[in-house]
Amino acid sequence: MLEASRRGFLAGSAALPAGAAMARGSEDLAVKVAGDLERYIGFGSKQAGGAGDNACGAWLASEIAALGFKIEQQPVSTPYFIPERAELSCGSAKAAIWPQPVVVPTGPEGVTGPLVRIDGAGRAAGSLAGAVALLDLPYARWSTAMVKPVREPIAAAFAAGAKAVVVITNGPTGKVIALNADGRKPMFAGPVALLAPADAGPFLAAAIRGEAATLVVTGEGGRRPASNFIGRLDRGKKTWLAVSTPRSGWYGCAGERGGGVAAWLWLARWASKAVTQHNLAFICNSGHEYENLGAAEALKATAPRPEDTHFWLHLGANVASQEWHDLTGQVLPSIDTQRFLSVTPALLPLARTLFAGQAGLEAPYSSDGLSAGEQTEILAAGYKSVAAVFGLHRHHHVADDDARCVSAANVASTARVFQQLVERVIAG
């Protein structure tokens, strides 16, 4: 399967314009991107502190260490949960669910109560006392449980006496969309589970009839060590260039994280040779899915000081994921437009010029009006010159975010423009 993926990446690379595919020296950078994507995807699940995340971190650290960066590891404590049973049942209907972190287990007998439907405004179809609440979210590309349309109805249901809440994550794939969470403690007073829209029909019907359902969430959980790292190439200069990317996530994260990781490596390889008048700090964080837990810790301990940093580029989610046809489920050669470029105000004119024609990025936002994810943490820490890309592609936080969701050609063309942005900013 990996070999097939590699052939697909290489075939996609052939579609690059001649100028974009030219090698720097004897290297074909697009082919390097293909290999990097294949390697990243091959690590499997990237949940923070798990085997895939740890192996990925070790690989990335070794890649930039070979370029001359000195690596400093930073331990981060992250939650984990390995399910034994995770299911919702009602009569003859039974469906797998995704336990919402930080997981509150039910015990082996589960939690049983009448199914009561609630909507995004917290309105309930009946009494929630002793109920299993069924939250039917509106259609969206969901990403986090921290937003009000998710957090507030769940909290209200528990306040009204619900024993558990099951959330239908309505979105473009019909599958469970995993939701980021506070990584420090459980967000809610009881068990919360996510249900795929494709599996929700029997339970919505049962809620209309007032039937009882049982939610079972059992498994092994707690906290485990994960690790951020920073690679420094200290040239003894006055100022630093910082480039960061998260690597962790709920599933395989091919489209969500693969493009950012490959672009980060592209920039590290280029900057280690070409950027000679700045010190370099290349930062790679775990714990992203716990509301940027890793990034927050890195900013406290390892990142260069704001006053010493000329420019910080953050490569977040959906750097260059594939577009799809919703009607047919067919992947397209083009890039998903739901990616956003946010820059500090002084960088807006340059960003508009450089990213003209780059789908989704051609209309950059001022960070005064729009920021997200780790960028928000970076700005809050006092960094003055910052650019970040982030977004939500069709399979964002979905189990089948796999090799179909990213191509070397699109990642390479995007990485090249970010290289141009760095060149122009640090020359100014």
Language model region names:
Residues 1-17:
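N-terminal secretory signal peptides and thylakoid transit peptides that target proteins
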Residues 26, 42-51, 140-148, 152-153, ...:
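Second-shell loop/turn segments in exported
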Residues 26-30, 35-132, 139-141:
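Noncatalytic luminal/extracellular "stalk/propeptide" segments of secretory-pathway proteins
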Residues 29-51, 61-68, 124-126, 132-147, ...:
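Catalytic-core environment of secreted peptidases
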Residues 93, 97-125, 181-255, 266-273, ...:
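Soluble metallo-hydrolase cores and metallopeptidase-like ectodomains found primarily
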Residues 98-191:
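Extracellular/luminal Protease-associated
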Residues 238, 285-387:
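Metal-dependent peptidase/peptidase-like ectodomains
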Residues 280, 394-428:
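His/Asp/Glu-rich mid-to-C-terminal helical/loop segments that flank catalytic regions of hydrolases
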